[in-house]
A protein has these predicted regions:
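Alpha-helical transmembrane segments of multi-pass membrane transport proteins
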Residues: 3-390
Length: 390
């Protein structure tokens, strides 16, 4: 693994292109229109605004894999709207923080691209494997907020009847706001999973499509374009330098024989594959408290990869367990970065402990989703096995 050239790896060229796509969508105000349209369309559901926020987060996550961007934008857009509507602060905070973390799992995820490079796996199969787990987690979040608001309406009051526009206007908003962005997402993912384009090529098409959407919404301004380019360059540089530093540490660790010691320790324990999976996921969970996902992937995942083969675990299934597990690194106090992103944009309106309390139920849902996927591996493996059957 360590003999490969990293910085000229063609798969990594997709990272800045997907970032550019996400920042264009954000700066063009497309996400705000999307949230408004979904909020109107789901007004009959309990916690309709929370449902709209989670759906918007899931869709926006397909355009950008940067957690901070999603949580920050939704913290400025959806959180104040929910509070004005009478939503409980802890409940609203949990929705924004958990929904904003979906970008690390739902493809085309930057984390999955980096994982593909490290583990030498097919990014196409990883994307296919992540679709159903990502939808499952988003669906569990939505189901939770609906059930909780149904039994405790004070958490998320229903909108007044006079606030709901006619059906024709709702349909118009959905067609104008939801359909174009959803079509762009389907185009990007469809070309990747259909084998018509590499992730980098699909990202380039998506970035061009975002420019077209910005023009369509009359928000294609030089200021927005310049900010998108600057933020893309800044975030790409941050990711690449984290990559270089973490990879250097991992290379030295491997050269000094650290991997062999770790492997021999595990092999000497005489454990079953399921025990190996439980131990590794506990380790990843604990590492998520002090470390970013890049350090976890680049430093520790290469240690586990030979053991994955030794215990006969499907590498794509293992990757999906880690991807789900890394959700917890953004939700687990005291280093729950999503909470600090939200606190940063709403510092005067919510206490950090309120955010932490709101996050806890969603953290439990992530752990439940991991158990569910472990019990039913087909959630992750059916689609890639079907699409790429040899």
């Amino acid at each position: 693994v360590y003999k490969r050239q990293i910085m000229d790896n063609t798969v990594l060229t997709a990272v800045p292109l997907f970032l550019f796509l996400g920042y264009l969508v954000e700066r063009a105000g497309i996400v705000a229109k999307l949230f408004f349209a979904i909020r109107l369309a789901s007004h009959r559901l309990p916690a309709s605004m929370a449902v709209a926020a989670l759906v918007t987060c899931a869709l926006f996550s397909t355009a950008t894999g940067i957690i901070g961007a999603v949580v920050t934008l939704m913290g400025l857009l959806a959180w104040p709207a929910m509070i004005r509507a009478g939503y409980d602060k802890k409940f609203a905070s949990g929705v924004i923080c958990s929904g904003g973390c979906l970008g690390i799992l739902i493809p085309p995820s930057i984390m999955l691209i980096v994982y593909a490079v490290i583990a030498q796996l097919s990014p196409l199969r990883l994307f296919a494997a992540a679709i159903f787990p990502g939808l499952m987690l988003a669906g569990l979040y939505i189901l939770y907020v609906i059930i909780r608001a149904y039994f405790n309406p004070s958490l998320a009051p229903k909108p007044a009847a006079e606030e709901i526009p006619p059906r024709a206007e709702i349909l118009k908003e959905v067609l104008v706001s939801f359909v174009p962005l959803f079509s762009l997402i389907i185009l990007v993912l469809g070309t990747i999973l259909g084998g018509l384009a590499t992730p980098a090529e699909a990202a380039a098409v998506g970035a061009f499509g975002a420019l077209v959407l910005s023009y369509f919404y009359k928000s294609l301004k030089w200021k927005n374009f310049k900010e998108s380019v600057f933020l893309t360059a800044k975030t790409s540089a941050m990711i690449m330098w984290l990559f270089v530093g973490s990879w250097t540490f991992a290379s030295v660790f491997s050269y000094l024989g650290g991997h062999e010691v770790f492997e021999q320790f595990f092999k000497s324990m005489d454990i079953q594959p399921w025990q190996f999976l439980v131990i590794t996921q506990i380790i990843i969970f604990l590492l998520g408290w002090p470390l970013e996902w890049t350090e976890i992937l680049i430093i520790f995942v290469p240690i586990f990869l030979p053991l994955v083969e030794f215990f006969g675990v499907n590498p794509y299934f293992f990757a999906m367990l880690i991807a789900l597990n890394l959700q917890t690194s953004f939700l687990t106090p005291p280093m729950a970065m999503s909470a600090y992103y939200l606190k940063g944009v709403q510092s005067r309106n919510v206490e950090l402990m309120q955010i932490f309390r709101g996050i806890m139920p969603f953290l439990a849902i992530v752990i439940f989703a991991m158990v569910l996927m472990y019990m039913f591996p087909g959630i992750a493996l059916w689609l890639p096995d079907t699409l790429f059957a040899e």
